[in-house]
Amino acid sequence: SVGFKAGVKEYKLTYYTPEYETKDTDILAAFRVTPQPGVPPEEAGXAVAAESSTGTWTTVWTDGLTSLDRYKGRCYHIEPVPGEKDQYXXYVAYPLDLFEEGSVTNMFTSIVGNVFGFKALRALRLEDLRIPTAYIKTFQGPPHGIQVERDKLNKYGRPLLGCTIKPKLGLSAKNYGRAVYECLRGGLDFTKDDENVNSQPFMRWRDRFLFCAEAIYKSQAETGEIKGHYLNATAGTCEEMMKRAVFARELGVPIVMHDYLTGGFTANTSLAHYCRDNGLLLHIHRAMHAVIDRQKNHGMTFRVLRKALRLSGGDHIHAGTVVGKLEGERDITLGFVDLLRDDFVEKDRSRGIYFTQDWVSLPGVIPVASGGIHVWHMPALTEIFGDDSVLQFGGGTLGHPWGNAPGAVANRVALEACVLARNEGRDLAAEGNAIIREACKWSPELAAACEVWKEIKFEFKAVDTLDK
């Protein structure tokens, strides 16, 4: 018998296996690999598979104490990226045994934890993941999901309306609560803490929670509708975060909020479990996502962060607008939206979806369109996002010349007009402006909003685009 053979071995000899047939239980990953000059794509692909699973830079004698064939990641297919020089799409299959059940943290630590600093690669991007149903079933997922949220709020047949309170920092708790009340009274369903509103010297969290709860109950009594404010429970420690969520539940409010990337997946999953057990909806903000997902050749796509969130748990998540000030190409954004809401999503490379994904009845997440949008965008948003969405107008509500409540009225009237027109069979894409103009005739608040924002557009090309 041959003894242990020390030394450095090419990765592709062990980890590049084009003949491998993937299993239903494998986690599949699609990477965009940019090898260093002189490194063949097969070696680069195999290096990714090795470094994100069982491999290290040299053979080690302890390899003989386990079954590498059972546990190793395998690069099973490589193809050039269309229209790009020296970039390859590498597909890697990971056996399910490599991952702790119910832990997004462990899944990411394995798949993207170490390999992105690897010297043989100039750049690396995780484009998509196929999560096997066997693994999905180890997660709770979103605390409630779309249908349960509608039933809790008693709101059907239209998108929900939100507003981020601005200025995001600097208001006292009482003035903040006042702004919340005006927006909710005017016809919005939700108002929102901004992502960096936590507990600062000018407004401690407990004071904010109390004044916002007062605003919610007062506006509910006046309008006869259920209202909510996304109370941001994000904090410096998990214990403090949970303390804030518990206080929100004691106040009887319907929804709390978390910054899931800066807060971390472990904290987020704990909060999602608490929210399901205690009947709280959970709004998720994606602060920090563009650090990870905006560059086209390095990092990971928002598609992957989105799937991770559905596993970890959240009832809403920001999803780009297609028409506002923040990044989001239409096809890519719609691909994201389907992965959040639908139970089964077919592979469709034209929308950036590399794998067919079956969510096996894991609850859906409502996409939130937010960032630089106003009443003139309403027809496009209604058409693009459909009913199961939250349309969030911060400046588009608070920037109204007559104040917050009229700003809220303008948005609600514009939304109701668009939903009515759609239900009557009109074409929102073609007739959008006409629909809004007609509605202005019986809403002076909407007419004033249309006057202020008639010419505003944010016209820049998206950075993260699809490969044609």
From Swiss-Prot:
The disulfide bond which can form in the large chain dimeric partners within the hexadecamer appears to be associated with oxidative stress and protein turnover. Its cofactor is Mg(2+). The modification N6,N6,N6-trimethyllysine is found at K5. Mg(2+) binds at K192, D194, E195. InterPro entries: RuBisCO, RuBisCo_large_chain_AS, RuBisCO_lsu_C, RuBisCO_lsu_C_sf, RuBisCO_lsu_fd_N, RuBisCO_lsu_N_sf, RuBisCO_lsuI. Pfam families: RuBisCO_large, RuBisCO_large_N. GO terms for cellular component: chloroplast. The record marks K325 as: Transition state stabilizer. The modification N6-carboxylysine is found at K192. Binds 1 Mg(2+) ion per subunit. One of its GO terms (molecular function) is magnesium ion binding. Substrate binds at N114, T164, K168, R286, H318, S370. Keywords: Calvin cycle, Carbon dioxide fixation, Chloroplast, Disulfide bond, Lyase, Magnesium, Metal-binding, Methylation, Monooxygenase, Oxidoreductase, Photorespiration, Photosynthesis, Plastid. Belongs to the RuBisCO large chain family. Type I subfamily. The basic functional RuBisCO is composed of a large chain homodimer in a 'head-to-tail' conformation. In form I RuBisCO this homodimer is arranged in a barrel-like tetramer with the small subunits forming a tetrameric 'cap' on each end of the 'barrel'. This is Ribulose bisphosphate carboxylase large chain. It comes from Salvia divinorum (Maria pastora).
